[in-house]
Every structure is written in C-alpha cells, then in structure tokens.
Amino acid sequence: MSRHSLSAAAAIFFVSSLASLAARAETVSQTLDGKTLSVDLACVDKVEIQPSAGLAGKVVIGATSSKDGELKDFVFKGGEAASVTRERRSCPSTGLDRPKISVSIQVPAGMAIDITNGGSTNYVVGAVGVLHARLAGSGYLTAVSATDLDIRISGSSSVNVGQTTGPATVKIAGSGDFRIGNTDMPSFKIDVRGSGKVTIDNGRIGTLTAAVAGSGALKIMATVQDATLSTVGSGDIEVAKVTGTLSSSKAGSGTIRAGRS
C-alpha cells in the first residue's frame, strides 16, 4: 500500500473513531423545583454551580458523560428542596476506559447549597448564599462567595472561598486545606485534628474559637475582636491582631501567636 493510501486510511480511521466517541456520549438535563439544593455525586469529574437570573424557585441541571449509559444512576428530585444524587458509590479505576462526567447546575442567586463528596470531584461554585459541604477524599471546592459556611473535611480535600459575610464553622480531620480570601464574619469556629491547614488572607472576625490537635496550622491574617485559641501537640496558630479578649492554652510543642492592638 502506498504512503498516500496509508495516510488516507489513517484519516478515515481517526474520523470514524471521533464519530464513534460522539455517538457514545450521553447528556441528561432536568429542571427541578426547590428553595435549596443538595448535591451528592460520586465518580464525577467536575460539578459547576452558578447563579442565574430568572430562576426563582427553579434549579436547572445538565449532566454529560463521554460514555453512554453512565448517567442512568443519577437521581433528580424536586420539591421544597431540590437534590441530585448518584446511587453509585464505587468508581472505576483510572484509565482510558474511565468515562469523563461533568455536571452543570444553574440556581437562583443566594440559594443555599449543600454538597457531599467522597472522592476527587472538582466543585466550582459561584456567588451563593449558605454553603455547607462534607468532603471525604481528595476533592476540590472553590467558591466565589458565601454568606454562611459550614465545612467538614475528612481526608485531603481542599476548599477555597473568595469572600464570606456570615458565620463560619470549619472542621478538618486529616490533611485537608481551607482558605478564605476576604471575610467580614461575626463568628468563626475552627477545629483541626491532624495536619490540616486553615488560612484567612484578610478581613474582620467578631469571635474566633480555634483548636488544633496534632500538627495542623492556622494562619488568620484578619483583625479579631475576641479569640479563644488552643493547641495540643505540635500545631501552630497565628492571628494577625486581637483587639479584645484573648484566651489561649497550649499542651505540647505547638505555638500560639496573636498580635495585640
């Protein structure tokens, strides 16, 4: 066979392969009623949640898989609370046969979001209201802003929130990482057990209650009114400034540093 014939055959094979892959792809879309949203999706590569104008009381969900038949175990429910879950709990091993699955969700501005993730899913969240997340595994969650935070991390998951304006609670068991860019919150409760890290880049906090057990590290580059700080083990707590009451306790080789006005 000539070189030209080989090239033509390769081109035909490539085009037919693309067509075959496209034919195998699957897409599902749902519009649900709901005042809040709960998301619990196993074995998904990416979930993006964004606010959209004109969606009062509605949630629009679209899921795409590179392989046909992979979305049949998705469960969509509407009502007072909208939810999307996946019945599957064991993920296929990594490799060429593993399907790529992504989910896009549009919600009303300010909607409360509750996320549960037990794997390595990447969550991208826009400006929402209340944001609760329970992350077990090695996933990522980034959010533009939230008005109220409750984050629970067990494992090595990472959470990054651009801005917060309400109370926050963060609990880390393991080597997880949590960061807020800028904050103006009335209260912040932190509990780190293990080697987890919590960082606040800038802002103001009314009441800070922070405890580290293990080798974790807290770096709070915000102005705090009242703070209660404690370490057990080799952990480290640093607070840029405390203007009011400061209470601290330490057991082990850890350090507590707090600037005073």
Annotate each language-model stretch with its function.
Residues 1-10:
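Bacterial N-terminal signal peptides that target proteins for export
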